[in-house]
Curated annotation (Swiss-Prot):
The keyword Cytoplasm applies. This is Tubulin polyglutamylase TTLL5. It is found in: Cell projection, Cilium; Cytoplasm, Cytoskeleton, Cilium basal body; Nucleus; Cytoplasm. Its main location: other. It comes from Pongo abelii (Sumatran orangutan).
Length: 1299
């Protein structure tokens, strides 16, 4: 594109200059300022860092723009400046346009600044950024204007000076307090206390009351980082960027005093939480509500969906920011007047950290001098790059070579100065030359009457005031994503009296800026009086006007990604390169004009330019008001259509014969503004809404039918096109189901070329539009026949509406549809909710497409699904931050034994509906004779159904061949008992043996945060069992006293805690949850053990291997001394433990037991167990030796009764012989609970001091179980190493266990 700097500057003819001005005006990086728009100011584009565009770099290179970075290293700032043609100079150089520093500036450096040079700090900014100075300033404002008016900080004390006051306050309220150093950042030196004795008084610190009721999202604490730009302190001008960051802690919030030292729970600083192992980062810049860092807009949209008033919240946040800066305004403005030679030399970007409590009241935590610009995640780059680019644009870098400031500029322009910059008015030495030039420009444009113009308002103003007024208005025109929160017509009335720096600039700016708004002073003053009378700093709802709602809509909108910005700028650039219409290529005689004509044309052109900017801003704001509710469609256009003003210009040119003034004046005539009508309580009828939606779809179809144009076929372009077409496919799939007429959808295959797919998709969309329009016509006919008058009353004028539809662009239709959907709280009017029954069963897999991207062609209209599909949809908005993309599913393992018949009823396994899965599938298994089932693994989330035992089988195979299925299974109980919905439930009495063998071969690893709770639960459970057995009760009475509901509640709590950690799943945590589930099974079977088993059943260990059989011990009468219930329970427990030991031993040594059923060599559990046992061989040997020595030292002198005898069978396993009385009835063997591997050490039960019970050692104190062959043999012979020990009681003997 031709630019003025690339041409030969020797040609100084007037025609050449005019052409150069025209070319320069079209450049995307130039915005013209000054009275006659003669001073070029550089416009920054955030997407420039993605590509090396010479068209953007050429401006900075032509003017030799430069920067230097001192005492900091900001890669983002360096990248943006370099991409716009700046070059970096040495830190000691004085020829620069920008000095970016990380510390405060010395006064002598500020005095040497020229008018074109800028620095990123004001003098004495530490009045805000040092915590002690900020506290002092806020306290001073509280004393002056009242405590409640400036109650924006928690109760704070400065130690050691105010230590006595702090102790006095602590004695009244002993809540937690937070200690912060007065001059630190990134969470360094911050800790919590609950006693004054814990504070070190060696240095100055700040102690603030800890806000113990923060607003939580998914039970996690968070704060908000806000970016505040101040361009001037005299007059005070404050901007707030529309996007920020919500930073989450990595540990769920708990008010308990035991967690007071957990910084990952109470501190939200990124520098602190990134060190946590639970920190989650998001790699997709379009996903803003996942991980430990959200965008502020995503947080606000979430709160709005939860029913919170985000408009009032952001009004309170603006109130907090303005009051904070006003508290330090006097000191900083005084320093600027003393040290800074030019008002525009300094600007400052502050980082405000705000915490929101449960009542939606924002609290100021701190103000950062140089907020972090590090981009550790794509979301950081998107937000911070856009913010920095918009900030540089607002500040306004004049395109001027910094080397020019060394020479004294002449009073009048010379040839050399005009050659270096022909578009900038020559300036004298400061300060008179700039004022003279501005005054001349202002006098020449005194006839301007449009809104926002200076017009006749310059009368009575000094030169400096005129210059300040012009600069503030131009800054606001270039604000981009920044929102000016002070001064505005509302905030000036509320906070103007708080200003302490008494100068005329603030008053002049307020009166001149807002004089065309009528007289809102009375209503605003009434609102302020009401607020003052109430004594509360909160803004009343009545005073929240339309501007506050507009600001809230801007804060809630999603920020465009850099890729979308790049494509939009490229499309606008292509439009600018098209041939100009006759309006531009005027006859040569039009260049010869008087000065008055030129000024009049310039006024009209400026009016048109400002109106176009205002219309664009209003359109953007209206588009971003879209509601993020469940059924609101997100309609975002990727490519803006060519403006229709060109066709209007052509028609006017042909009719008027070249009178440009009349042409452009006629374009100012107001047109039918449908959005404004909707905002003014107007509404569309249902037919009109469908007509508008059909017109929007037609625009999308036309865009699909267009060629790719000059677009280069790259991988990124193809991916974006594919993604956008996928969204149209998803829309057609869902929308076609709601049509009353049948429509056959033949969607293109993904194997086709992109252009072919676009053509087919456009054809299908056209067929859909035809059917859709027919249904709309039928609806209109029904309405006319029924003569429903309210439709005509609700709808707008039909003629104007049809004219609007004919002329509206895609963006305008999108804005109307978005606002209409937000206003009516539903999108069902576009497609309805009617769906034929034949289509209800259609389910489309949409998991492959991404949603909610601002650059997509269109978003699918979300229709309320049928009832039968409501449970299958994914609703993960609230939990999306902590859920991973892949879900762990349970594995169903069943074994086959052909020798043993199965006479019980078949078990049907059905899949439990899972909210994390996109659909529900039912898996029905009907095992034949000899089949039984067991779940080898369980999901991380366990339902809280009580666990019931199943009927014991006579003989069950000991090994299983794995068969994998997905999902968690529901197992109907053959005995008619309630279903057990836990994944660890087993069919068959000993099917948990396989899980036990699998668990014994693994190493347990739990997070430190979960150890305490798990240990406490297990210890409490076993101590409760021992206490019950101590009282000599039998099994049935013990089960009656045992409160199973408490175990169920604890199990549910543990399951919820583990489910919250699904983003960092661990198979070891699942194993622990399985053991707690089995524990519930074991306790629930006791009270049914005597009645559920035939008297002939008594399982013991056979000499030949792990085969369960029923057998009587001939030595039973000799050793009989136990009650029937205790004896039976004891026998079953030891038999089960022996089976586990035997199987683990056989797997570790490789000696296969002689049994008619041999496990397959490819068994998953066998290979996994052998692998894990081999890895733990050396460690387990040492742990076994230590455990054996410890227990032998403790129990060496003890003598145990000979009630049970354990004998070893050579290499084949262990045999347990139990003695029972001849008249004793055997009981059912319960489901044995297998503890975690870390608790399966060689353990000898410790005899109680009173010889009435056998205590079980705490799980956390037991060493890891050995897996080697030697460890198994030695452990079973000398240490009595069962898998888990169940206490046995007797009313006569102190113990019944014999080694």
């Amino acid at each position: 594109m031709p630019i003025v700097m690339a041409r030969d500057l020797e040609e100084t003819a007037s025609s050449s200059e005019d052409e150069e001005v025209i070319s320069q005006e079209d450049h995307p990086c130039i915005m013209w300022t000054g009275g006659c728009r003669r001073i070029p100011v550089l416009v920054f584009h955030a997407d420039a860092i993605l590509t090396k565009d010479n068209n953007i770099r050429v401006i900075g290179e032509r003017y030799h723009l430069s920067y230097k970075i001192v005492r900091t290293d900001s890669r983002l700032v360096r990248s943006i400046l370099t991409a716009h043609g700046f070059h970096e100079v040495h830190p000691s150089s004085t020829d620069y346009n920008l000095m970016w520093t990380g510390s405060h500036l010395k006064p002598f450096l500020l005095r040497t600044l020229s008018e074109a040079q800028k620095v990123n700090h004001f003098p004495r900014s530490y009045e805000l950024t040092r915590k002690d100075r900020l506290y002092k300033n806020i306290i001073r404002m509280q004393h002056t204007h009242g405590f409640k008016a400036f109650h924006i900080l928690p109760q704070t004390f400065l130690l050691p000076a105010e230590y006595a006051e702090f102790c006095n306050s602590y004695s009244k309220d002993r809540g937690p307090w937070i200690v912060k150093p007065v001059a630190s950042s990134r969470g360094r030196g911050v800790y919590l206390i609950n006693n004054p004795n814990q504070i070190s008084l060696e240095e100055n610190i700040l102690v603030s009351r800890y806000i113990n009721n923060p607003l939580l999202i998914d039970d996690f604490k968070f704060d908000v980082r806000l970016y505040v730009l101040v361009t001037s302190y005299d007059p005070l001008v404050i901007y707030l960027y529309e996007e920020g960051l919500a930073r989450f802690a990595t540990v769920r919030y708990d008010q308990g005093a035991k967690n007071i030292r957990n910084q990952f729970m109470h501190l939200t600083n990124y520098s602190v939480n990134k060190k946590s192992g639970d920190y989650v980062s998001c790699d997709d810049p379009e996903v803003e509500d996942y991980g430990n860092k959200w965008s502020m807009s995503a947080m606000l949209r979430y709160l709005k969906q939860e029913g919170r008033d985000t408009t009032a919240l952001m009004a309170h946040v603006e109130d907090l920011i303005i009051k904070t800066i006003i508290s330090a305004e006097l000191a900083i403005a005084t320093a600027c007047k003393t040290f800074v030679p030019h008002r525009s030399s300094c600007f400052e970007l502050y980082g405000f950290d705000v915490l929101i409590d449960s009542t939606l009241k924002p609290w100021l935590l701190e103000v950062n001098l140089s907020p972090s610009l590090a981009c550790d995640a794509p979301l950081d780059l998107k937000i911070k790059a856009s913010m920095i680019s918009d900030m540089f644009t607002v500040v306004g870098f004049v395109c001027q070579d910094p080397a020019q400031r060394a020479s004294t500029r002449p009073i009048y322009p010379t040839f050399e100065s005009s050659r270096r910059n022909p578009f900038q008015k020559p300036q004298r030495c400061r300060p008179l030359s700039a004022s003279d030039a501005e005054m001349k420009n202002l006098v020449g444009s005194a006839r301007e009457k449009g809104p926002g113009k200076l017009g006749g308002s310059v009368l009575g103003l000094s030169m400096e005031e005129i210059k300040v007024l012009r600069r503030v208005k131009e800054e606001n025109d270039r604000r981009g994503g920044f929102i000016r929160i002070f001064p505005t017509s509302e905030t000036w009335e509320i906070y103007g009296s708080y200003l302490e720096h008494k100068t005329s600039m603030n008053y002049m700016l307020a009166t001149r800026l807002f004089q065309d708004r009528g007289n809102p002073r009375r209503s605003l003053l009434t609102g302020r009086t009401r607020m003052t009378a109430d004594g509360a700093p909160e803004l009343k709802i009545e005073s929240l006007n339309s501007k506050a709602k507009l600001h809230a809509a801007l804060y809630e909108r999603k920020l465009l990604s850099l890729e979308v910005r790049k494509r939009r700028r490229r499309s606008s650039r292509l439009r600018a390169m098209r041939p100009k219409y006759p309006v531009i290529t005027q006859p040569a005689e039009m260049n010869v004009k008087t000065e008055t004509e030129s000024e009049e044309e310039e006024e009209v052109a400026l009016d048109n330019e400002e109106e176009e900017q205002e219309a664009s801003q209003e359109e953007s704001a209206g588009f971003l008001r879209e509601n993020q509710a469940k059924y609101t469609p997100s309609l975002t256009a990727l490519v803006e259509n060519t403006p229709k003003e060109h066709s209007m210009k052509v028609r006017e040119w042909n009719n008027k014969g070249g009178h440009c003034c009349k042409l452009e004046t006629q374009e100012l005539e107001p047109k039918f503004n449908l959005v404004q009508i909707l905002q003014d309580n107007g509404n569309l009828s249902k037919v009109q809404a469908r007509i508008a939606f059909s017109a929007y779809l037609q625009h999308v179809q036309i865009r699909l039918m267009k060629d790719s144009g000059g677009q280069t076929f790259s991988a990124s372009w193809a991916a974006k096109e594919d993604e956008q077409m996928e969204l149209v496919v998803r829309f057609l799939k869902r929308a076609s189901n709601n049509l009353q007429h049948s429509l056959r959808m033949v969607l293109p295959s993904r194997r086709l070329a992109l252009l072919e797919r676009r053509r087919i998709l456009a054809h299908q969309l056209g067929d859909f539009i035809i059917v859709y329009n027919k249904e709309t016509e039928q609806m209109a006919e029904k309405k006319s026949k029924k003569k429903v008058e309210e439709e005509e009353e609700d709808g707008v004028n039909m003629e104007n509406f049809q004219e609007f539809i004919r002329q509206a662009s895609e963006a305008e239709l999108e804005e109307v549809l978005t606002f209409y959907t937000q206003k009516n709280k539903s999108a069902s009017v576009f497609l309805g909710t009617h769906s034929k029954s034949s289509k209800n069963n259609n389910s489309y897999s949409d998991s492959g497409a991404k949603g909610d991207h601002p650059e997509t062609i269109m978003e699918e209209v979300k229709i309320k699904p049928p009832k039968q599909q409501q449970t299958t949809e994914i609703h993960s908005d609230k939990l999306s931050r902590f859920t991973t993309s892949a879900e762990k599913e349970a594995k169903l393992v069943y074994s086959n034994s052909s020798s043993t018949p199965f006479s019980g009823p078949t078990a049907t396994l059905q899949k439990i509906p899972n909210t994390h899965l996109s659909s529900v599938t039912t898996s029905d298994l009907s095992p034949g004779p000899g089949h039984h089932s067991s779940l080898s693994q369980i999901p991380s989330a366990i339902p809280s159904m009580p666990h019931q035992p199943t009927v014991l089988l006579n003989t069950v195979s000991a090994s299983a061949s794995p068969c994998l299925h997905t999902g968690t299974q529901n197992i109907p109980n053959p005995a008619g008992l309630p279903r057990c919905r836990s994944g660890s439930h087993t069919i068959g009495p000993f099917s948990s043996f396989q899980s036990a063998a699998h668990i014994y071969s693994q190493k347990l690893s739990r997070p430190s945060s979960a150890k305490a709770a798990g240990s406490c639960y297990l210890n409490k459970h076993h101590s409760g069992i021992a206490k019950t057995q101590k009282e000599g009760e039998d099994a049935s009475s013990y089960s009656k006293r045992y409160n199973q509901s408490m175990v169920t509640a604890e199990l549910q709590r543990l399951a919820e805690k583990q489910a919250a950690r699904q983003y960092s799943p661990s198979s070891h945590i699942n194993l622990l949850t399985q053991q707690v589930t089995n524990l519930n099974l074991a306790t629930g079977i006791i009270n049914r053990s005597s009645a559920s088993t035939p008297p002939t059943l008594r399982p013991i260990i056979s000499p030949s291997g792990p085969t369960w059989s029923t057998q009587s011990d001939p030595q039973a009468p000799e050793n009989h001394s136990s009650p029937p219930g205790s004896r039976s329970l004891q026998t079953g427990v030891f038999a089960w433990e022996g089976e586990v030991e035997n199987n683990v031993y056989s797997k570790a040594t490789g000696v296969v037991p002689q049994h008619k059923y041999h496990p397959t060599a490819g068994s998953y559990q066998l290979h996994f167990a052998l692998q894990q046992l081999e890895q733990q061989k050396l460690q387990s040997r040492q742990l076994l030796d230590q455990s054996r020595a410890r227990h032998q030292a403790i129990f060496g002198s003890q003598t145990l009764p000979n009630s049970n005898l354990w004998t070893m069978n050579n290499g084949a396993g262990c045999r347990i012989s139990s003695a029972t009385a001849s008249g004793q009835k055997p009981t059912t063997l319960p489901q044995k609970v297998v503890p975690p591997p870390s608790s399966c050490a060689s353990l000898v039960p410790k005899p109680p001091p009173n010889h009435k019970q056998v205590l079980r050692r705490a799980t956390s104190q037991r060493a890891s179980k050995g897996s080697s062959a030697e460890g198994q043999l030695n452990g079973l012979q000398s240490s009595l190493n069962p898998a888990a020990f169940v206490p046995i009681t007797s009313s006569t003997d102190p113990a019944h266990t014999k080694i």
